From Swiss-Prot:
Annotated organism of origin: Conus tessulatus (Tessellate cone)
Chain positions listed as propeptide in the UniProt record: 21-50
Tissue: Expressed by the venom duct.
Protein name in UniProt: Conotoxin TsMMSK-011
Top-level taxonomic group: Eukaryota
């Protein structure tokens, strides 16, 4: 039984190698709205142009200023 399972696993790995799976490691996933330009932080009323960050309401305006 174990040898049949090993053969099946080997065949599956040869037909569909793990390197063919697309990984999300090289894609930025933390700011998808900024990537698609859905949020214009420069025009936000909470954006501080001197500090180049948002003073409050960080769930609306990105990036947040450190407290």
């Amino acid at each position: 039984m174990m040898s049949k399972l090993g053969v099946l696993l080997t065949i599956c790995l040869l037909l569909f190698p793990l390197t063919a799976v697309q990984l999300d490691g090289d894609q930025p996933a933390d700011l998808p709205a900024l990537r698609t330009q859905d949020i214009a932080t420069d025009h936000s009323p909470w954006f501080d142009p001197v500090k180049r960050c948002c003073s409050r309401y960080c769930y609306i305006c990105i990036p947040c200023c450190p407290n």
